[in-house]
Curated annotation (Swiss-Prot):
Recorded metabolic or biological pathway in which this protein acts: Cell wall biogenesis; peptidoglycan biosynthesis
Taxonomic placement: Bacteria, Pseudomonadati, Bacteroidota, Cytophagia, Cytophagales
Motif (Meso-diaminopimelate recognition motif): 402-405
The enzyme's E.C. designation: 6.3.2.13
Binding site for meso-2,6-diaminopimelate: R378, D402, N403, P404, R405, G455, E459
Family: Belongs to the MurCDEF family. MurE subfamily.
Cofactor(s) annotated in UniProt: Mg(2+)
Source organism of this protein record: Cytophaga hutchinsonii (strain ATCC 33406 / DSM 1761 / CIP 103989 / NBRC 15051 / NCIMB 9469 / D465)
Any one GO molecular function term: UDP-N-acetylmuramoylalanyl-D-glutamate-2,6-diaminopimelate ligase activity
Catalytic activity: UDP-N-acetyl-alpha-D-muramoyl-L-alanyl-D-glutamate + meso-2,6-diaminopimelate + ATP = UDP-N-acetyl-alpha-D-muramoyl-L-alanyl-gamma-D-glutamyl-meso-2,6-diaminopimelate + ADP + phosphate + H(+)
Protein name per Swiss-Prot or TrEMBL: UDP-N-acetylmuramoyl-L-alanyl-D-glutamate--2,6-diaminopimelate ligase
Binding residues for ATP: G112, T113, N114, G115, K116, T117, T118
Gene Ontology biological process terms from the UniProt entry: cell division; cell wall organization; peptidoglycan biosynthetic process; regulation of cell shape
SUPFAM superfamilies: MurD-like peptide ligases, catalytic domain, MurD-like peptide ligases, peptide-binding domain, MurE/MurF N-terminal domain
Length: 486
């Protein structure tokens, strides 16, 4: 593909050099540049691609895309393209390089603090059951029809993302459902993608380590809807007071869903048990295998999205009633002595509260024992809040490590302990080692009790000082219950 084809629709400031030259590869990592490559100089969190322009020209790059022109004597035969926003240009160029794969799919993006993974996973499974070849891009995994590609971020970088979408098109997929994180919107990783629709679930306290203020976080989520085309749909949870903010400037056709008020798609939770929930959806009663009020919202969002994509209401509900939750989302193990252990990815205050409220409604006279930690190098303000919420709903709380990353685990625990009120101190233990913490919870539990192990969900590792060690809450729980004879 030639340079002129790659910069189609890119907002250009200047072009110095030929544009009728072939490009064999595109990259934003200077280490991957080879002769014939186009290098896009992107400003990252820890490094600036502009610092490596001289290096990539020496390596034989055919073209360089940048915001600031390089201060070097000679650019050889390299075409220099100046743009206003190189991160946005990267998205557009990646889309052009892979022949605009998103335009050949019905691509739906899901954003919000909680529920993204469950929602996209349910949509993926639903559309498979409806007979479509479907792709999935999620925190847990990326799937091309039925081929799993492991995920490393909620939203991959623009080049990886377009390659995945191109592979989906090649595999015959007609639909793709993807999580869209606030980071991805701000970093322009979704620039150049053509969405058939966007879905907003809710917004609560998260990622303030990156966005700094809650207003900035809201604006980051809103960016996604601002960029939707006029032939797409924007579906919002109208029970979240910030839902309307998301669609203030969107060109998309807007729709709402709600459990509490009038909306385009209306649901009402009838009952919920540890086996599932019954809900009225647009006047039709149906039973689902998911649990809790928060999942009623996820199910309603999935139903509404499917209908907006042209599917039959009754067929959607019938197929949706057969689908189970995503891995690590309210995932249950029941021991020989009838102790229920729930593993959930809840790693924000709101998500933890939702899960514990659901367990409280269903527990009867039995105890709730919560094991919870907070990740390192992430929003520290939520740490005492998470501990406080765990105490409010639990009979025993074991504070522990999550993914400490590059922070000291004890320092994170100390910050969590600040959220424990004097009246709750007797019910709280701090156990630094996560496996030991789960063991303590299992030891405290008796027949009928419920243990919640929160924070990591589907993850199969624990990240400490830059190293990911094998660690799966679900396997640890099974091992400990068997060892303890519980």
């Amino acid at each position: 593909m030639q340079i002129k084809d790659l910069i189609y629709k890119v907002s250009l400031i200047s072009v110095s050099g030929r544009t009728d030259v072939d490009v064999t590869a595109i990259c934003f990592d200077s280490r991957k540049v080879e002769k014939g490559s186009m290098f896009i100089a992107v400003r990252g969190v820890s490094s600036d691609g502009h610092s490596f322009i001289a290096d990539v020209i020496q390596k034989g790059a055919t073209a360089v895309v940048c915001e600031e022109l390089p201060e070097i004597e000679s650019t050889a035969d390299c075409t220099i393209i100046q743009v206003k926003d190189s991160a946005e240009a990267l998205g557009m160029i990646a889309s052009n390089f892979y022949d605009s794969p998103s335009s050949k799919l019905k691509l739906v993006g899901v954003t919000g603090t909680n529920g993204k993974t469950t929602t996209v996973t349910l949509l993926y499974r639903l559309f498979r059951k409806l007979g479509y070849k479907t792709g999935l891009l999620s925190t847990v995994e990326n799937i091309i029809e039925d081929k799993v590609v492991q995920a490393t971020h909620t939203t991959p970088d623009a080049i990886s993302l377009n390659k995945l979408l191109a592979d989906m098109v090649k595999a015959g997929c007609t639909h793709c459902f993807m999580e869209v994180s606030s980071h991805a919107a701000v970093q322009r990783r979704i620039a150049g993608l053509q969405f058939a629709g966007g879905l907003f679930s809710n917004i609560t306290h998260d990622h303030l380590d990156y966005h700094k203020t809650f207003d900035e976080y809201i604006k980051a989520k809103k960016l996604f809807f601002d960029g939707l085309p006029n032939d797409s749909f924007a579906l919002i949870n109208s029970d979240d007071k910030r839902g309307r903010v998301m669609i203030q400037n969107t060109r998309a056709k807007t729709y709402t869903y709600s459990l509490l008020a009038l909306a385009d798609f209306k649901g009402k939770l009838i009952s919920t048990t540890m086996q599932g929930l019954e809900m009225d959806v647009d006047g039709i009663q149906a039973w689902f295998r998911l649990i809790g009020n928060f999942n009623a919202y996820n199910l309603l969002a999935v139903y509404a999205t499917a209908v907006l994509l042209g599917e039959d209401k009754e067929e959607v509900l019938m197929q949706l009633s057969t689908i189970e939750a995503a891995n690590g989302r309210f995932e249950q193990q029941i021991s020989a002595t009838r102790i229920t252990v729930i593993v959930d990815y809840a790693h924000t205050p709101d998500a933890l509260k939702n899960v514990l409220e659901t367990i409280t409604e269903l527990k009867g006279a039995n105890k709730i024992i919560t094991v919870v930690g907070c990740g390192g190098n992430r929003d520290a303000a939520k740490r005492p809040v998470m501990a406080d919420i765990a105490c409010q709903f639990s009979d025993h709380v074991v504070l522990t490590s999550d993914n400490p990353r590059n922070e000291e685990p004890q320092a994170i625990l100390t910050e969590m302990e600040k959220g424990v009120r004097i009246v709750d101190k007797k019910k709280v233990l701090s156990v630094l080692d996560r496996k030991e913490a789960i063991k303590v919870a299992c030891t405290l539990a008796s027949t009928g009790d419920i243990i919640l192990v929160a924070g990591k969900g589907h993850e199969t590792y624990q990240e400490i000082k830059g190293v990911k060690y094998p660690f799966d809450d679900r396997l640890i729980i099974k091992e400990l219950l068997d060892t303890l004879g519980k």
